[in-house]
């Protein structure tokens, strides 16, 4: 598989430091408001990327953080709670972290390896800052804040391809008392009365944003790890500053091999913003459309390109999802009508879609082409395979169905055909019991188990001593 690396501006062969283990970190939300469709695009892409790596045989350790203390959270708490904000500010991140898990579940995003929170790692961050001060890469300002000295790190700007002189002239950096350089950034922010704080050797305060992600990613994944991701808006200054901190702390050029960024999402040609009043929340969209339709809508655009979000696109994706389910449902039910041997080479033609599907994902995660191949296979199943089902063996029909489901699993669609977790172990146990009953020629009881499972939507397919099962909603 080849993937575009923002650090090198090239599409590169994907390799990992540890064979068959892919370690990655994706910057998570600052939980101070509702998630919007731009957030969804980022997390769905990395979920598809993770699923494809797993299909290739990798164990994937994906870490996603929560920045659960930040100026935005503090300001939101003041708006909602007034003078009680100091006591109740934690209610804000808790509320929106809960929403994160609710929305990602509806989007069928698989759970991460870890979800570290800033507030649970402050002690580690203080230790990092102490080390950076000792090494001469950070300095203490008169108010007790600690700043990272950008000029001390060679090749600053390597990720965003900008020079320090240009950044100083045009960077969006607010001047702060105690800074030696406008580009220097806070590792530790001194306490403001009425706001949350933690102890440190310098003053009461809280950690800075850029430091937080470096500490949490390397704590869970080690350094260097394989890939670091997020939205394209994080390239500068956030990811640039992460690289600078890690260079100073570890003495390595890059603490992540691949930097992967997802393009902007626009509404009517403009980025979403509160001032324009064009923010579309995930809750709003998922109250009207399925998570699978939204996943397909995201996947119809290449992850690195800007994506224009429209409800027309979402309806197109919804219609596509219906076709995908029709192919699955009808082929699952038609398996019983398959013949004993193959009379036509339908499987070879069907599996060409799978070959093209995986070829597209191998080529820098080209999900638009992958979606078209999955959709093409669905249409082929409906238009051709089902009409000639009696001319292929049941095993061949099941091979086609399994490959189709395998492709859908990578994109995270057809998820509603999955056996509910609370049923899955029971089904497996009943299939094993039924196999023993068949061996003992207790066919009446074996047939009863098949019948009862069918009533739950679980269809059993016997091929000699082997039994496969499919699930219908």
Curated annotation (Swiss-Prot):
Motif 'KMSKS' region: where in chain: 271-275
Domain of life: Archaea
Alphabetized InterPro entries for the sequence: Cys-tRNA-ligase (IPR015803), Cys-tRNA-synt_Ia_DALR (IPR015273), Cys-tRNA/MSH_ligase (IPR024909), Rossmann-like_a/b/a_fold (IPR014729), tRNA-synt_1_cat_dom (IPR032678), tRNAsynth_Ia_anticodon-bd (IPR009080)
Short name of one Pfam family: tRNA-synt_1e
Keywords assigned: Aminoacyl-tRNA synthetase, ATP-binding, Cytoplasm, Ligase, Metal-binding, Nucleotide-binding, Protein biosynthesis, Zinc
Organism annotation: Pyrobaculum islandicum (strain DSM 4184 / JCM 9189 / GEO3)
Leading EC class: ligase
Localization annotation: Cytoplasm
Gene Ontology CC entries for this record: cytoplasm
Protein name: Cysteine--tRNA ligase
One term of GO molecular function: cysteine-tRNA ligase activity
Cofactor(s) required for function per UniProt: Zn(2+)
Record-listed Zn(2+) binding positions: 27, 213, 238, 242
Free-text cofactor note: Binds 1 zinc ion per subunit.
């Amino acid at each position: 598989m080849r993937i575009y690396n923002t650090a090198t501006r090239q599409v590169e062969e994907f390799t990992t430091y540890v064979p068959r283990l892919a370690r990655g970190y994706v910057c998570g939300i600052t939980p101070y408001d509702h998630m919007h469709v731009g957030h969804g695009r980022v997390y769905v892409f990395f979920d598809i990327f993770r699923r494809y790596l797993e299909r290739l045989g990798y164990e994937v350790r994906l870490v996603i953080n929560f920045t659960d203390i930040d100026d935005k959270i503090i300001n939101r708490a003041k708006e909602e709670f007034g003078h009680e904000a100091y006591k109740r500010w934690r209610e804000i991140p808790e509320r929106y972290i809960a929403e994160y898990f609710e929305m990602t579940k509806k989007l069928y995003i698989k759970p991460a390896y870890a979800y570290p929170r800033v507030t649970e790692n402050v002690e580690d961050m203080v230790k990092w800052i102490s080390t950076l001060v000792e090494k001469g890469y950070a300095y203490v300002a008169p108010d007790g804040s600690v700043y990272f000295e950008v000029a001390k790190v060679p090749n600053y700007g390597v990720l965003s391809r900008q020079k320090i002189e240009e950044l100083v002239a045009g960077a969006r950096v607010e001047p702060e008392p105690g800074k030696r350089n406008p580009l220097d950034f806070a590792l530790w922010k001194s306490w403001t009365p009425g706001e949350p704080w933690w102890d440190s050797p310098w003053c009461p305060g809280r950690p800075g944003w850029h430091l937080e992600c470096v500490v949490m990613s390397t704590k869970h994944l080690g350094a260097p790890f394989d890939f670091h991701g997020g939205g394209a808006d994080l390239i500068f200054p956030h990811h640039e500053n992460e690289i600078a901190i890690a260079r100073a702390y570890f003495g390595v050029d890059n603490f992540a091999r691949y930097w992967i960024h997802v393009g902007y999402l626009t509404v009517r040609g403009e980025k979403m913003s509160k001032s324009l009043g064009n923010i579309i929340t995930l809750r709003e969209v998922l109250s009207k459309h399925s998570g699978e339709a939204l996943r397909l809508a995201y996947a119809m655009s290449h992850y690195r390109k800007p994506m224009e979000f429209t409800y027309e696109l979402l309806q197109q994706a919804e219609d596509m999802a219906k076709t995908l389910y029709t192919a699955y449902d009808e082929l699952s039910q038609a398996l019983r009508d398959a013949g004993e041997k193959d009379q036509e080479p339908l499987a070879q033609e069907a599996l060409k879609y799978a070959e093209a599907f995986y070829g597209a994902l191998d080529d820098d995660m080209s999900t638009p082409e992958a979606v078209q191949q999955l959709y093409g296979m669905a249409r082929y199943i409906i238009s051709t395979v089902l009409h000639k089902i009696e001319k292929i063996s049941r095993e061949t029909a099941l091979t086609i169905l399994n490959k189709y489901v395998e492709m859908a699993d990578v994109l995270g669609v057809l998820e509603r055909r999955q056996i509910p977790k609370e049923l899955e172990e029971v089904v497996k146990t009943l299939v094993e019991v039924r196999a023993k009953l068949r061996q003992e020629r207790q066919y009446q009881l074996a047939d009863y188990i098949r019948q009862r499972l069918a009533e739950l939507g679980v269809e059993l397919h016997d091929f000699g001593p082997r039994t496969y099962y499919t699930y219908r909603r």
